[in-house]
C-alpha cells in the first residue's frame, strides 16, 4: 500500500509518500512544495501542478490530508482551507480516495503524544522512517501518511473512546524501514 500524506499550506505544502509492506514502512518520496512569492491564485496553481506531478510519479493508492486547525485566526483558517482545497482537488482528479485526520490525531499516532512539537515530529520521522526531513511541513506530511497506514493496517476505529489507545498501539507495531545510527532496527 502506498499513501500520500499532505500537510497543506499556501506558502509551504509538505508531502510524504510512504509505502507499507507488511509492517515495514519505506519513504518513497518526501519534500516541500514552495511556490514562491506570488499572488495567492498563482501559488495555489503551482502547488496543484506540483501535487499532480508527484501523484503521477509516485502513484499512491490513497491520500491523507491534515484537517483544518480551528484555533487559527479566521484569515489563516480561510487561507489554509484554500490550500486544503487544492490538495483535495489534486487527489480527486487522480481518482484517489482521501482521508482526513486532525493534527492531534496524527501526532498521537506518529509520536504517541497528541501535543508533540515540531522537534519531536522531526525526531520521530528520523527514528521511525530513517528520513531526514528538512522542514516540519515534510515531517508532518510523513506523519499524516503513517497515521493513515496505521489505521488501515490495524483497523483502528474512526471514532470512539478507544481511538487514541488503538492509534498508539498500531503505531508501536510498525517497524522502521532502515536501521538507526547504532545499527539496530
From Swiss-Prot:
Instruction: Give the SUPFAM superfamilies listed for this entry.
Output: Ribonuclease H-like
Q: What is this protein called?
A: Crossover junction endodeoxyribonuclease RuvC
Its biological purpose: The RuvA-RuvB-RuvC complex processes Holliday junction (HJ) DNA during genetic recombination and DNA repair. Endonuclease that resolves HJ intermediates. Cleaves cruciform DNA by making single-stranded nicks across the HJ at symmetrical positions within the homologous arms, yielding a 5'-phosphate and a 3'-hydroxyl group; requires a central core of homology in the junction. The consensus cleavage sequence is 5'-(A/T)TT(C/G)-3'. Cleavage occurs on the 3'-side of the TT dinucleotide at the point of strand exchange.
Swiss-Prot/TrEMBL cofactor(s): Mg(2+)
- Where it mainly occurs, coarsely classed, is cytoplasm
- EC number, UniProt record: 3.1.21.10
Q: Which UniProt keywords apply?
A: Cytoplasm, DNA damage, DNA recombination, DNA repair, DNA-binding, Endonuclease, Hydrolase, Magnesium, Metal-binding, Nuclease
Write out the residues that bind Mg(2+) 1. 7, 137
- Any GO BP annotation: DNA repair
List localization entries.
Cytoplasm
Q: Name one GO cellular component term.
A: cytoplasm
Molecular function terms in GO for this entry?
crossover junction DNA endonuclease activity; DNA binding; magnesium ion binding
Regarding protein family, the annotation reads: Belongs to the RuvC family.
Name the active site residues: 7, 66, 137
**Subunit structure of this chain's protein:** Homodimer which binds Holliday junction (HJ) DNA. The HJ becomes 2-fold symmetrical on binding to RuvC with unstacked arms; it has a different conformation from HJ DNA in complex with RuvA. In the full resolvosome a probable DNA-RuvA(4)-RuvB(12)-RuvC(2) complex forms which resolves the HJ.
One Pfam family name is: RuvC
Lineage per the UniProt record: Bacteria, Pseudomonadati, Myxococcota, Myxococcia, Myxococcales
